[in-house]
Each structure stands twice: as structure tokens, then as C-alpha cells.
Amino acid sequence: MRTKNNHALIAGTVTSAPTAYMCCGERFWSFELTVMRQSGAADTLEVNCPQLVLETVETGDKLCLEGQVRSYAKTIDGKSRLSVALFALKVQEHKADCNEVELEGYLCEKPEFRTTPRGRDICYAMLAVNRERGKSDYIPQVFWGRTAKRVSEMQVGTQISLSGRLQSRSYTKKNATRTVFEVSVGKVSEGGSNDA
């Protein structure tokens, strides 16, 4: 179930009680999937999955899901916020945790470059990834090192292909802890080659 410009293969353990919901006359599951990195750190990701793809799901299940990274508008504390989740299209046999994302899209905001207090170059960017039927997903990206500098010099509207992992990152702002979901990019190329 590979799509040209948005593909994800993510395997991990279900760590929240699944909730069922209806959308457009179809029944879906929503749950959190925790994926271990090689470093030992963990990413806890949101998953939406049609029940046609996965009939039942329980906390503790080990799943390997193939699908797309999608963005949704979600109301949190009375404000509309961008929510990023894996939309599962296929279930595969779970062998080991993995987190692989390939995207092709367009920079839709000016990339934001900075150097961390530890001296590491970092660049945040928003990628618009087109879907069928004229819709787009807006997916936050984070680039590192020389790649961060290179991307920071790109213009809004530049088409790029990339590969990386979908990660969760928590931070504190105004005494409240928030979690963001973004793609930590490992490889990037300019243009629509999808050879990231």
C-alpha cells in the first residue's frame, strides 16, 4: 500500500486504550503506539486505523503498520492545534520496532534556522504533502547539521523529497507541558525524485 509521496512503516507496542469513533460512515480505531529508537529513547505516536484494516486492538499488542503521515486540526484547550498521526492502511507482521517515513512535498513556510545552546544547527520547516482529491497534509519537519543550513536557505514553494522518522517531542511553555509530532529528517533532496 505504498503511495508515491507519503509512505510510513512504523512498528511498536500499543500503549493506550484504543477508542472507537465514526467518520464518514466508517468505524476507526484511535490509539497510541510506542516505538523504541536504537538509542533506547521512545516515541509515542498517535495512530488512526480503519476497523476494516484492523478488526481488534488491545493495549500491549505489538503491531507493524504501513500507511501515511497525516495532519488534522484538533481543538486543545479551546484552541485549534495541528495534530500529526499515522493513518494506517495495512497491517504487517511485527518483527522488531521500526520507524521509517518517506515524504515528498513543498515547503509551505519559511524554514526557521537556529543553533542550540550546545552548538548544534537545527532547522524547523513545514512540508505540504498533497493527497488525492485536492487535500494536503501539513507536516512539521526538523533538520540537523549541514542539512539544516541547506534547507534554511530554500525558498517557500521548493519541492523536496526526504526520509526520516516520525517522532514525539515534549517541551514546556508557560508552565504547561506540550507534545509535538514531527519528522526528524535523515536524508533530503531537492525536487520530486523521491530518492531521499
Specify the residue positions occupied by each region the protein language model found.
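Single-stranded nucleic acid-binding surfaces, predominantly the OB-fold ssDNA-binding core
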Residues: 1-196
